[in-house]
Curated annotation (Swiss-Prot):
Gene Ontology cellular-component terms listed: extracellular space
BP GO annotations: cell surface receptor signaling pathway; female pregnancy; lactation; mammary gland development; positive regulation of lactation; positive regulation of receptor signaling pathway via JAK-STAT; response to nutrient levels
Protein name: Prolactin
Keywords: Disulfide bond, Glycoprotein, Hormone, Lactation, Phosphoprotein, Secreted, Signal
Modified-residue entries (Phosphoserine), positions: S56, S64, S120
UniProt cross-references to CDD domains, sorted A to Z: prolactin_like
Annotated glycan sites: N61
InterPro entries assigned: 4_helix_cytokine-like_core, Somatotropin/Prolactin, Somatotropin_CS
Length: 229
């Protein structure tokens, strides 16, 4: 009996910690960088990075959950996992594949790369939401996550623009991004082809959100803590 009580207490404690962490992410993610109507609002670089790291991690978690839910609901028995994943539309941006590669890139270049990846997802995320809404019996769990990711991607982009403005204030970065042309694939009449297009897009979103999450943690350590972390 004591062992069961101990196990139950441990499970409840873990659940409380997970809920607390989720509420923290949602709270921080919902805060604008500056309050509406604020004049000469100044936010420290450290605080900007703190928010960006929490937000990027939140987006990656949502992306992973959405991919897993889509896979479970639509991909089972269709052989999607055995198909070669098509090249992601952001592949042309030559993002580093791991931490070791990212460490070789100058921080200003890595910051601008993050901006480009985030901008490259504005259009596909907008259309992802609209196309999921149009799906027969659109699952609320997937739709709500798509809506949330689209909104938080905009917030993260806003925060990253402020970070770049503080790190390299004299340089105006061109709004370079990779163009997405996958909308026709999401609207195909053939169900298998259409669902695989969704599967591929969600796979790419999970991949890119994971990269951004890792890049931001590396940059926070390098810029805010002078690599002493």
């Amino acid at each position: 009996m004591d062992k069961k009580r101990s196990s139950l207490k441990g499970s409840l404690l873990l659940l409380l910690l997970l809920v607390s962490d989720l509420l923290l992410c949602k709270s921080v993610a919902s805060l604008p960088i500056c309050p509406s109507g604020a004049v000469n609002c100044q936010v420290s670089l450290r605080e900007l990075f703190d928010r960006a790291v929490i937000l990027s991690h939140y987006i990656h978690n949502l992306s992973s959950e959405m991919f897993n839910e889509f896979d479970k609901r639509y991909a089972q028995g269709r052989g999607f996992v055995t198909k070669a994943i098509n090249s992601c539309h952001t592949s042309s941006l030559s993002t580093p594949e791991d931490k070791e590669q990212a460490q070789q890139i100058h921080h200003e270049d890595l910051l601008n790369l993050i901006l480009r990846v985030l901008r490259s997802w504005n259009d596909p995320l907008y259309h992802l939401v609209s196309e999921v809404r149009g799906m027969q019996e659109a699952p609320e769990a997937i739709l709500s996550k798509a809506i949330e990711i689209e909104e938080q991607n905009r917030r993260l982009l806003e925060g990253m623009e402020k970070i770049v403005g503080q790190v390299q204030p004299r340089i105006k970065e061109n709004e370079v991004y990779s163009v997405w042309s996958g909308l026709p694939s999401l609207q195909m009449a053939d169900e298998d082809s259409r669902l695989f297009a969704f599967y591929n897009l969600l796979h790419c979103l999970r991949r890119d959100s994971h990269k951004i999450d890792n890049y931001l943690k590396l940059l926070k350590c390098r810029i805010v803590y002078d690599s002493n972390c």
